[in-house]
């Protein structure tokens, strides 16, 4: 390994860090040798109503997968994120909200946030929402979205946040799956100067007869735009708050009671409702937030994710607020009104820690130094990356141009299902290698296995698995425990299968190589190929579709679709555009195909399985690396696809 690619821990970071290398090694060792003792001690960072006596009861045996942490303890998540901070830091800023328009921002103290959460919790109770009921939150990035999440947690309701970029059809599917009782939305969202019709999307979603579980729609006024109103069903958020009491006792919740459901893409098409519970999740989010970001009281922390994704749940809301941090909530996008927006926000709010995605970094990098022109940036102390592996080139640009070579980068690897960061450098303990997620967090035991499930030792490449449970782990898929077991524990028995491939180097550092299943990673967001294929095939002119990921300069992975049309249908540029718009409507803009190639037939095995491996190679013009195609039902299809791809590339 060349010395140039290693960035040792900076002495000034090591001097002030919460976790230096010796501490990391000692704590990690204890966490894997004596998990009960380690997590019993760490759990003291939470305020318990009834202390737990048992720490860890977990089994990865695929006949009885069962995950419980601190099972007999009770507590309340909202109390841990709000009430317990009031005496010491009630007047500390909890949330800095930065609007889409740079002229708009708000600062909300812990005391103010606590009051609004209590009022809205009472308002929800007034709408017959109680412990165990599911509430769908389909909101822009405004403080009321965080209020809604914490209000649910306060009364023991389960929230299901759906990203505001999802279509009415996708929203309806996520409402139906969890029999949601109430939907909370806004009249419109604002993002990059454009309005999104959130309330209209909810109205459309609720025309689906299977969404009849929804009794009320609570609407927050964001733009004041024209919306349709159903006076039997719709209620204004502000009207509810005006009459609500600001006193609301937090509900005593069991450690293993449900906190939230978050839908993530699966390889079979139907989105999976990942279920997280109360104590283990909160403890893990708080501990990882403190240690990975080396968070110190009074610092300004900005995670650029959307609350509709797990990163927003764990590292905008629950982790930072449990730690009494100041968390920045940004409504807009990194390039609006122009590409300097991120640096301007950093300077305006004196941001110390920036946690963003490689997609945003690549978008800024594409503009050279323009994105940091006129910026000071001296408040920054630490940079983070999340959502997909960051390529070394983007890492170097982020380190040199945004961090001015003064800020360590924590390149974090984790998933919706893991609740929090599993593999990441700790800034005061880990020498950095651009592109590597480096070492496991406390209590996390990663391993590599071959395709037969045999453990591979030393420097090697293989399937990434985790050998034992950690408190932030998802407990099940909502209403479908069999699918949970099949997806994560059947492939490699007795292990949690991440769906990712990884390489381990001679220093024991992990390098994530990408998905090994049929899931794409577009701009840091997971999307199942089956979900896009299903949407495409639902179009009346399409007979069959196959989706593969291809490298994309900005998004990381682009969406490449092979389409077979029904007999009698003619391919055309107009139809290409129509199909793109169709997928946008079915799933959302995020799933819009980057490339559509017409395919008279697809390469299939004799059993009818589409050979995606071949399609991936053709899409990236690796025509000589197709491997053995003699087993295909019709090998002639391949040459035709290659010719079409060549003519597309030439055009």
Swiss-Prot record:
GO terms for molecular function: acetate-CoA ligase activity; AMP binding; ATP binding; metal ion binding. Disulfide bonds: none annotated. Mg(2+) binds at residues 537, 539, 542. It catalyses: acetate + ATP + CoA = acetyl-CoA + AMP + diphosphate. Keywords: Acetylation, ATP-binding, Ligase, Magnesium, Metal-binding, Nucleotide-binding. ATP binds at residues 387-389, 411-416, 500, 515, 526. GO terms for cellular component: cytosol. The modification N6-acetyllysine is found at residue 609. SUPFAM superfamilies: Acetyl-CoA synthetase-like. Belongs to the ATP-dependent AMP-binding enzyme family. HAMAP family: Ac_CoA_synth. This is Acetyl-coenzyme A synthetase. The lineage of its organism: Bacteria, Pseudomonadati, Pseudomonadota, Gammaproteobacteria, Pseudomonadales.
């Amino acid at each position: 390994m060349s010395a140039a690619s290693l960035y040792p821990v900076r002495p000034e970071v090591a001097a002030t860090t919460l976790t230096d290398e010796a501490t990391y090694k000692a704590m990690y060792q204890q966490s894997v040798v004596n998990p009960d003792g380690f997590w019993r001690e760490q759990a003291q960072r939470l305020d318990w109503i009834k202390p737990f006596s048992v720490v860890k009861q977990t089994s990865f045996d695929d006949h009885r997968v069962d995950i419980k942490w601190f099972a007999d303890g009770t507590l309340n998540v909202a109390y841990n994120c709000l009430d317990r901070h009031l005496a010491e830091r009630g007047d500390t800023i909890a949330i800095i909200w930065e609007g889409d328009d740079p002229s708009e921002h708000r600062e909300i103290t812990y005391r103010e946030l606590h009051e609004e959460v209590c009022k809205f919790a009472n308002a929800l109770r007034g709408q017959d929402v109680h412990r165990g009921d599911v509430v769908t939150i389909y909101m822009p990035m405004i403080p009321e979205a965080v209020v809604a999440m914490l209000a649910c947690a306060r009364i023991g309701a389960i929230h299901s946040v759906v990203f505001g970029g999802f279509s009415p059809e996708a929203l309806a599917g996520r409402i139906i799956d969890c029999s949601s009782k109430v939907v909370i939305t806004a009249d419109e969202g604002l993002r990059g100067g454009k309005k999104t019709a959130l309330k209209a999307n909810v109205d459309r979603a609720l025309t689906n007869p299977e969404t009849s579980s929804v009794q009320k729609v609570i609407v927050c006024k964001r733009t004041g735009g024209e919306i349709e109103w159903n006076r039997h069903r719709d209620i204004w958020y502000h009207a509810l708050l005006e009459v609500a009491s600001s006193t609301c006792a937090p509900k005593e919740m069991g450690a293993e009671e449900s906190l939230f459901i978050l839908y993530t893409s699966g390889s079979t098409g139907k989105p999976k409702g990942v279920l997280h519970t109360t104590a283990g999740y909160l403890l893990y989010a708080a501990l990882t937030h403190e240690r990975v970001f080396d968070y110190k009281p009074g610092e300004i922390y900005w995670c650029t994710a959307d609350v509709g994704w797990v990163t927003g749940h764990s590292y905008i809301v629950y982790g930072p607020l449990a730690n009494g941090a100041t968390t920045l909530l940004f409504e807009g996008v990194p390039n609006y009104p122009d590409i300097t927006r991120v640096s301007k926000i950093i300077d305006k709010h004196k941001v110390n820690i920036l946690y963003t995605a490689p997609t945003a970094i690549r978008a800024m990098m594409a503009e050279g130094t323009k994105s940091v022109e006129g910026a000071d940036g001296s408040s920054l102390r630490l940079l983070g990356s999340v959502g997909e592996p960051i390529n070394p080139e983007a890492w170097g640009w982020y380190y040199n141009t945004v961090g001015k070579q003064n800020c360590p980068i924590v390149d974090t690897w984790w998933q919706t299902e893991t609740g929090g960061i599993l593999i990441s450098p700790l800034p005061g303990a880990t020498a950095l290698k651009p592109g590597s997620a480096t070492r496991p967090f406390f209590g996390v035991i990663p391993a590599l296995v071959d395709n037969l499930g045999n453990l591979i030792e030393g420097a090697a490449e293989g399937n990434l698995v985790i050998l034992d449970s950690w408190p932030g782990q998802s407990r099940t898929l909502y209403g479908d425990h069999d699918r949970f077991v099949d997806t994560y524990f059947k492939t490699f028995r007795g292990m949690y299968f991440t769906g990712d491939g990884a390489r381990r180097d001679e220093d024991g550092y992990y390098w994530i190589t990408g998905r090994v299943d049929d899931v794409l990673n577009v701009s840091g967001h997971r999307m199942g190929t089956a979900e896009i294929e299903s949407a495409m095939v639902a179009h009346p002119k399409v007979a069959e579709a196959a989706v593969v990921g291809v490298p994309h300069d900005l998004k990381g992975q682009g969406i490449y679709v092979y389409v077979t049309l029904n007999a009698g249908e003619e391919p055309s540029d107009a139809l290409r555009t129509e199909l793109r718009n169709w997928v946008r409507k079915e799933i959302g803009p995020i799933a819009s195909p980057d490339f559509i190639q017409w395919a008279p037939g697809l390469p299939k095995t004799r059993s009818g399985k589409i050979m995606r491996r071949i399609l991936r190679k053709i899409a990236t013009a690796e025509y000589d690396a197709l491997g053995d195609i003699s087993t295909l039902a019709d090998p002639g299809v391949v040459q035709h696809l290659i010719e079409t791809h060549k003519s597309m590339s030439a055009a």
